A protein has these predicted regions:
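HTH-adjacent hinge/linker in prokaryotic transcriptional regulators
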Residues: 29, 33, 38-84
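Glycine-rich Rossmann-fold phosphate-binding loop(s) that bind the pyrophosphate
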Residues: 89
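NAD(P)-binding Rossmann-fold cofactor-contacting core
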Residues: 104-125
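Basic, low-complexity intrinsically disordered segments
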Residues: 101
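Hydrophobic/small residue at the entry helix of a nucleotide-binding pocket
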Residues: 92
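Extreme N-terminal segment that seeds HTH/winged-HTH DNA-binding domains in transcriptional regulators
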Residues: 1-28
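Phosphate-bearing ligand-interacting subdomains
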Residues: 15-23, 127-230
């Protein structure tokens, strides 16, 4: 499965959210036109996005909501358990740990890590905060699939490296900086480290979202549909 745009995956998440809402309202069928209207894209875009992963509907009859929801859950990997650790257990990290709904999608928090001696040893959501130096030993006995970073920007790269060193394959970075899957070797030349070769990094930047929002408020003629179709 290659050549799937990042924006397509983001839209699949949106379609899933819409389907969950429809199912909660006891709506049994939907269509590409209906999904498109609710998602703010075109029906063509909906069909194109879904076509990357197979055929889910019936021509002229649309989609069965529970079936399409189940298939999108499968495509997104939400039909299996994902073990998650959080590095950085300050206000943001604790808010992430206590955010409701993660367990509904099989995301299970298994470890919390920090460097602040005032936090180490405390209990958050039933988990004891450990020092980040214990991360590698922790992953030897506990499977960890993802790491969420909620650390200051100047510590983000080192924290991400700790996760990569421990064999964690996915990193969701909430620090206001871009994690680079590169390390400087002793000669000063950049190279991809072995630990980073299989690591997927998602950078979540709240300020970037605010900046995009400001742009679209100032440029309302540039609709979401127009920008998606020209990606």
């Amino acid at each position: 499965m290659t050549g799937i745009p990042t924006a397509t995956i983001s839209r699949l998440v949106t379609y899933l959210r819409i389907l969950e809402g429809l199912e909660a309202q006891d709506v049994s069928r939907t269509s590409s036109n209906d999904l498109a209207e609710r998602a703010g894209v075109t029906a063509f875009q909906v069909r194109k996005d879904l076509a990357y992963f197979g055929r889910f509907g019936t021509r002229g009859m649309g989609y069965t909501v529970p079936i399409l929801k189940r298939e999108l859950m499968r495509v997104l990997g939400l039909n299996q358990t994902w073990n998650v650790v959080i590095v950085g257990v300050g206000r943001l990290g604790q808010a992430i740990a206590n955010y409701p709904g993660a367990s509904d999608y099989q995301f299970q928090y298994v470890g919390l890590f920090d460097v602040n001696p005032e936090l180490i040893g405390q209990s958050v959501r039933g988990l004891t905060v450990r020092h980040v130096d214990e991360l590698r030993d922790f992953t030897r006995t506990t499977r960890v699939d993802m790491g969420f970073l909620a650390v200051p920007p100047e510590r983000a790269q080192d924290a991400a490296q700790s996760l990569a060193d421990a064999g964690v394959r996915g990193i969701l970075n909430f620090a206001p900086t871009v994690i680079q899957p590169r390390l400087l070797d002793r000669s000063g030349q950049q190279e991809i480290s072995d630990e980073w070769r299989a690591v997927i990094v998602e950078n979540v930047d709240f300020l970037a979202g605010m900046k995009r929002l400001a742009f679209y408020i100032l440029n309302p003629h540039l609709s979401a549909v127009e920008t998606e179709e020209n990606e």
